[in-house]
Structures are given as C-alpha cells and as structure tokens.
Design a protein with these regions (language model features):
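Charged, compositionally biased N-terminal leader segments and the immediate start
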Residues: 19-42
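Active-site catalytic microenvironments in core metabolic enzymes, especially phosphate/sugar-handling
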Residues: 423-426, 553
C-alpha cells in the first residue's frame, strides 16, 4: 500500500492548542513561506523579505512576543507588513498566507525542501517542467538520467540529489525489499558468526519477500539477554515490543525483543525454544490469511516439535510450500489438490525485454547494452527507447528511429546469432492512441505501450486510455500497468480484471516491470491473469547495463504468484520469440 513519508523539517500543520510560539517557530513559518513563494515564482523582493525576517528572528536576543508593536516593527528586517504577520501567528498559531501556499503545493514538492542540494529554484523546475511531485518520483528520474536534460542539473548534481533522497527515504520507516535486503543479510551473517551454536532465521514480511518492508524480524533461540547485550553494545537502541504485531501473538513464552539501528531500521527478535523453532518460524513466515487457512485445513499442533519446515508440511500431509508463496488461501487450496509447479528462476530468463539506450534516456550505447547481454548469457535484447512525446526523456522522433534502426541492423550483422529486436516504449496518449502513425509502428518488431503523462486521472479515464491502447494491433506488451512507484506514487485506478481480460483477447502480454520501485503489474493479480491465459513479461526497464540486475526482483515478485517459465515472454528462446512475434503480427494482419 502506498504510504507517503511525513513532512519533515517544517511545522506546517494546523494550530492544535497551546504551544510555545517562540522566535524559532515564527522564523520557520517565514522561512517556509519564502521558499514556497520562490517555488511558485513570486516576486523575488517579496520572497526575500520573508527570508530576511526569518533570519532576523533567529538572531534576535529577546522574544519577539514580549516586544511592544511599535518596537517590533522598528527592527531592521521586520517592518509593518511583517509585523502584522507576526501578530497573526502570535494570536492564532498560524499564518493564512502560508496555508494558502501549502494548499496550492503538492505535499511531495514541499517535502523536497528536506533534500540536501535542492533549493526552491531547482524544485520549481522539477515540479513545473519535469512534472514530478514526489521525492520517490524524483529518485526514479535520477536513476533514469532525466535530470540531465534540464538546465542547472549536471551529472554530479543528479548523483548528489539521488544520494540525498536515498538517505532521506532510509529514515522514513518503510523500505523497498531491494534496498533493505543487503542490510538484512549483513545482520543475519553477524548473528550466525556471533551465535554459531544457536538457531536464527529471518522471518516475517522479509522472508516472504514482500515488496515493502516496515521492519526486519528473526526467529531465534538466542536469549533476550544475549540479544540485548549484542545489539546495545553495537549502538542499537532497545525499544519496547509491539504487542499488536502478529509476531508478538505467535511468539513463544521466551518472548520477543526489538531494537532500532543507528540508521533507524527496526529489528524484532522472536525468541523461542529449540524444539519449537521451526513451528515458530513457520507461523511467522505466513500471512494471516494463509495461516488461518492452514490451521483450518490441518488442525496441526504448533507446540509439536519438527526438525524442519519440510517435516512440518509432511506431517500435515501437504506438499512443501516455500515462505514466499504463503500469502493467499488459494495457494493452500491448490496444494491440497496437486503439487505446486516449479516456480520461475532467474536462470529461466533468456532475454532482456524493455531497455533504454543513449538514444533516449539510457546511460549506455546500443553496442554496450548488447555486449552486456551477451556477457550475461542472454540470447537477445529488446531495445525500447522512449517515443517522441516523451520530451522529458529525449524521446525519438521519426528521423532518429530510422537512425537507430540502421545501427541495429549493423550490430545484428556483426553480433549474430545474438539479436537486437527493434522496439519502442510508446507513450499512451490522452485518448489512448499510440505515439506514431501505423507506418512508423510497422517498422518495429514489437511495441511496448505505457502511460507516462497525466497520471492523475479517474478510473474511467485510465481505463479508456489503456483499453484503446490494448486494442491497437501494434501493441505487443502493456508496460507498467498502473504507473505506480512504490513508497512514492500510487498507481492510477484501474479495473484489473477488465484490463487482463482485454490483454488476453488482444494477445497483448502484460509486463511485470522488474524495477524495484515499480514491480508493476502487482504480483497479486498474476494468478488471475494466468487463469485467464495471459502471457506475462518480466522486464527490467533497464536504463543502463547495471539495470539488467533488476530482473531478479521481478522474478522474486513473479514467484509469489507461481509464474512458470512457459508463461513468461522473456523466458522464450530466440527462435521461439521470433516465431511468437511473427505469428502475432500475422493474426493481427499487420
């Protein structure tokens, strides 16, 4: 679920009752007002007057509230107009003018003021020219090299802004699985080394490989006292266990303990006895829905000792279900009828579909993208740079498409049997049309259709755009179905079943965009898609050769829904892929 980080650094909330309205409080109001006015392009003289007033108040040796009105307005940098604003704040705790600007500014834009290296002028460019309204979107834009296309943003600035955003997000309480995984692994390794005779295992949401992790959990036979000594010595803060958490409900009599790392990450330890270790591990590795269904189906005894989770499932007369599949009741229902099919692995991915080169907003040349594919053992590469409406991403106009296709032809001749397929990530326009005429679209081997603009729309509008694009015979793959950016931007509302059904009817594959900030389509809809006969395509949306590594995160998400290689387009071999494209075009008469 999308969860916007709170606004930090500014007290921009309504007045809620008695508080100390001191010089610093008033100065913060004026400082924020000055910056917001700057962002909105107001007269620089007016904006500067509020920043000067803020500076004056911060340095004032006495409380402004204790000064007579005449003396207050005589202070250099205050004056009559500012004096009236100070009186308003002293009386109400608020400033109406500031509230007006706050109401006219997206919360995420205000939040950007907390990012080191971003001032009002740059934020105005980000908001008004790049049409970015959250720091998560901005981080994604940094990763796609989009800032480089705008005045005042060089490569170094882009790197610094990206690093500052990552630091900020790390302290907001929720983390992408991809970002917290290395940290969790390091802590786990240290535990194994320090307590080599004890049993410990990561559990909870992390073990189920959910895309967003609020805190890390372990099941362990380490005693609470030993855990406390280990972590407090390392500079962690001991905090009270959360009695409402699911882990607390399933914890054994040995109890639980929680710590906060210097980075602000919460670690929870569920202490258990050796004979109930695997029972506790199992319980804490299930969603509430799955565990309830398991209890109803098996009537198992959680206090009975088991030497492994596999043994626990065997005792319940069930095939083993790995932790990442323990989400939905339907998984257990199907497992009671027949063994689960082997899930897709990263080794099953035979190609890179959906990648960007220097022709649009990628970091590498076509040759470099192809060479990296060959080095990693992939059989082919689908280059899908941005289309002409994507001015923010240096989208390709018709003449540059012809230039790119000529280079692809030359590379294919030189790199055979490796193949670069000609593609485009075509913007889905406001009316659902694709970005080029049929004559141009026919020059591509395949077309990925995606929404990139005007994301704030009703479900009716979103469905119209998507369905029109799906009905276009040239659309081969529907890209990032909802446009979401995890922890940054919710997706536009869609009727998933209708979209999936339309894709099946029109022989359009549905992308599982593997970028850790997207993972879109959501894995929770893949099971329905597979039941309807849909073809999924795990694609990295790579903007550099390093971006190929995102494939793994798409695979982790797909495994949660039981996707198999035969139902994933990027698992098709080179010749199978060629045949698929040819047969699809023939069926569409294009």
């Amino acid at each position: 679920m999308f969860k916007a980080p709170p606004l930090l650094g500014f007290r921009a909330f309504p007045y809620l009752g008695p508080m100390t309205i001191d010089n610093d409080y008033i100065a913060e109001k004026f400082s924020l007002l000055s910056k917001l006015m700057d962002i909105h392009g107001e007269n620089s003289f007016k904006t500067k007057s509020y920043s000067v007033a803020a500076f004056t108040l911060e340095k004032l040796p006495s409380s402004i509230a204790e000064l007579p009105s005449a003396k207050m307005t005589s202070i250099r940098g205050i004056g009559d107009a500012i004096g009236k604003k100070i009186a308003e704040i002293l009386e109400t705790g608020e400033l109406r003018l500031l509230q007006q600007y706050i109401s006219q500014t997206p919360p995420g834009v205000i939040q950007m003021l907390n990012i080191k290296g971003l001032g009002p002028k740059k934020i105005a460019t980000i908001w008004k020219e790049m049409e970015i309204e959250s720091i998560g979107e901005l981080l994604y834009a940094c990763q796609e090299n989009r800032l480089l296309l705008y005045k005042g943003f060089g490569e170094k600035t882009q790197q610094n802004v990206g690093a500052a955003i990552e630091f900020f997000l790390q302290n907001q309480g929720s983390h992408l699985y991809a970002e917290i995984e290395p940290y969790a692994s390091r802590i786990d390794t240290q535990l194994q080394q320090q307590f080599s005779t004890e049993q410990s295992s990561l559990t909870g949401d992390f073990r189920r490989q959910l895309e967003i992790i609020d805190h890390l959990q372990w099941v362990t036979t380490i005693t609470p006292a030993d855990a406390t000594a280990f972590f407090t010595t390392a500079g962690f803060e001991e905090i009270q266990p959360d009695p409402s958490s699911a882990s607390s409900a399933t914890a054994s009599a040995a109890g639980s303990s929680r710590f906060k790392s210097p980075e602000g990450i919460v670690l929870e330890f569920i202490h258990t006895h050796p004979d109930t270790f695997f029972s506790t591990l199992f319980q804490t590795s299930c969603s509430g829905e799955f565990l309830e269904a398991f209890n109803e189906t098996t009537h198992w005894d959680p206090h009975h000792p088991h030497p492994s989770e596999e043994a626990l499932f065997a005792a319940a007369n069930l095939p083993f279900i790995p932790a990442y599949r323990r989400e939905q009741r339907i998984v257990l229902d199907r497992a009671t009828q027949h063994p689960l099919t082997p899930d897709i692995e990263t080794t099953d991915i035979r190609a890179i579909i959906h990648s960007h080169s220097k022709y649009s907003d990628g970091s590498n040349t076509l040759a470099e993208m192809a060479a990296a594919c060959i080095e990693k053992g992939y059989e082919y590469l689908v280059i899908s740079d941005h289309s002409k409406s994507a001015g923010y991403a240096n989208g390709l106009k018709e003449d540059r498409i012809r230039e790119q296709h000529a280079e692809i032809d030359e590379l294919n001749h030189r790199l055979a049997p490796f193949v670069i397929f000609k593609s485009i990530e075509s913007d889905i326009l406001n009316d659902g049309a694709l970005d080029y005429s049929p004559d141009i679209l026919s020059t591509f081997d395949l077309v990925i259709a995606s929404v990139h603009s005007n994301l704030k729309m009703t479900e009716e509008k979103a469905m119209m755009r998507l369905l029109n694009a799906i009905n276009n015979p040239y659309t081969t793959i529907l890209g990032h179905l909802t446009g979401r950016l995890l922890l940054s931007r919710p997706g536009y509302p869609v009727d998933h079943k209708t979209i999936i059904d339309a894709c099946v009817k029109n022989k359009v594959a549905i992308e599982l965009n593997a970028h850790p900030r997207r993972l879109d389509m959501d894995w929770r809809w893949i099971s329905y898609a597979l039941d309807q006969g849909a073809l999924i395509s795990i694609d990295p949306d790579a903007h550099s050769v390093e971006g190929y590594n995102s494939i793994r995160h798409g695979v982790l998400a797909a495994r949660k829904a039981g996707l198999t290689p035969d139902r994933n387009l990027s698992s098709f071999g080179r010749e199978q892929f060629k045949t698929y494209l040819a047969e699809r075009k023939k069926s569409k008469g294009i």
